[in-house]
């Protein structure tokens, strides 16, 4: 691990085998009986933009994780049962989820019958006993999360496609890598080093380009031959679109919802704003990135080419609800400036062996 990089966290382990059925049913009944004003109709999964979040992404569970690690499963479950009426504190994905719900509110005002909205799913390997406290916390914060997947110790990744997941956020890097391998857009989310106030009315999402929106083709050139060869390669292939990266589909989903506001003449008032924040240089390699987005029928509201400069200070000005990058040092730099950053474990940069293999294979070209 490089100095200053965030530690990779893992989800708490499974609970005990015996489910607290009465507690679960009581909490679920309360949730189902919420007034219709607070509880709009849930969309069909195949029509919605589905965001799956883990329990430790949505809420802070540091003490619970410590108990599980140091004292084991039984003590962990006992602690959760004793504190199930105490809501968890918000975690790193909490402001992002609140912003998604703010967008949904605007969409329902404009399109009352449309199911083309965000649908948030709580995806966790916790046991149903812990689920009671999760439901109580969701009710406490007036979150609209109706779909739960609690797998009692098994990995929930196999269920992501069944939930039509467009994006999966977790504090467990192993599960995120598993999701990426399954072709699901996913990222490991980290808490910032300090709290920063973010917009309550506009969802702001910032993306790195290479190995996030785009494939890692260009990074392979850099690893194998250096920057000079990379600039030559990008110039020669300026009009050839890059292959898609793991989060291209999520940007596409955001763009689809943005167009619903544009069609109502609300482009300037759109509650979704997207940013491309890349280390590429505009003059030498920026055109290919923009032309690739254009070839997909996509765009970002802002495109920021930093030519290798640190991303943290710029992100501090943008104040996105989440920033996606494949490089851990960019994630750490964003954290230091108060940005909720998420690591996308994709591409040649994730594995030194892959980088060496890329250098060997590209050396023959």
Curated annotation (Swiss-Prot):
Any single GO molecular-function term of the entry would be: nucleotide binding
| Function description | Catalyzes the hydrolysis of ribonucleotide and deoxyribonucleotide monophosphates, releasing inorganic phosphate and the corresponding nucleoside. AMP is the major substrate but can also hydrolyze dCMP and IMP.
Enumerate the active-site residues.
Answer: 208
Cofactor list: Mg(2+)
As recorded in UniProt, its EC number(s) are 3.1.3.5, 3.1.3.89, 3.1.3.99
In Swiss-Prot or TrEMBL terms, this protein is called Cytosolic 5'-nucleotidase 1A
Report the sequence similarity comment from the record.
Belongs to the 5'-nucleotidase type 3 family.
Where is the segment annotated Disordered?
A: 1-23
What is the first-listed, main subcellular location in coarse terms? Answer: cytoplasm
Upper classification of the source organism reads: Eukaryota, Metazoa, Chordata, Craniata, Vertebrata
Subcellular localization is given as: Cytoplasm
Reaction(s) catalysed (UniProt annotation): a ribonucleoside 5'-phosphate + H2O = a ribonucleoside + phosphate; a 2'-deoxyribonucleoside 5'-phosphate + H2O = a 2'-deoxyribonucleoside + phosphate; IMP + H2O = inosine + phosphate; AMP + H2O = adenosine + phosphate
- For bias type Basic and acidic residues, the affected ranges are 1-11
Q: Please name the GO terms of the biological process aspect recorded for this protein, alphabetically.
A: allantoin metabolic process; amide catabolic process; AMP catabolic process; dAMP catabolic process; dGMP catabolic process; IMP catabolic process; purine nucleoside monophosphate catabolic process
Enzyme class at the top of the EC tree: hydrolase
Question: What activates or inhibits this protein?
Answer: Activated by ADP.
What InterPro entries does UniProt report for this protein, alphabetically? 5-nucleotidase
Domain of life, source organism: Eukaryota
Q: Name one GO cellular component term.
A: cytosol
